[in-house]
UniProtKB/Swiss-Prot annotation:
Annotated Pfam families: DUF3194
Native species: Methanocella arvoryzae (strain DSM 22066 / NBRC 105507 / MRE50)
Protein name (Swiss-Prot/TrEMBL): Uncharacterized protein UNCMA_09870
Source taxon at top rank: Archaea
InterPro entries in alphabetical order: DUF3194, MTH677-like_sf
Length: 79
């Protein structure tokens, strides 16, 4: 897989996870940035909802975990 395909798949995994946890109407702002350099993956997520910051942070951490697992799976297929 090309890096762009991995980034797209990881991005979609993040979006799918967040929207499975947070109803769209509660999301005020969602920014997702994903980059790959070699085998290093960078994921930056900003989530603003009407929920507490602690709950949003937990959702972000869960989404990063899901995305990292997806990236590891896809990168392993490239080896």
């Amino acid at each position: 897989m090309k890096e762009e395909e991995i980034i797209d798949a990881v991005y979609q995994a993040v979006v799918d996870h967040i929207y499975s946890v947070v109803p769209a109407k509660r999301i005020a702002d969602l920014d997702i940035s994903i980059g790959i350099e070699g085998r290093d993956l960078t994921i930056d997520i900003t989530l603003v909802t009407d929920r507490t910051q602690e709950i949003d942070q937990k959702t972000i951490e869960e989404a990063i975990k899901v995305a990292t697992e997806k990236a590891d799976e896809l990168m392993a297929k490239n080896d």
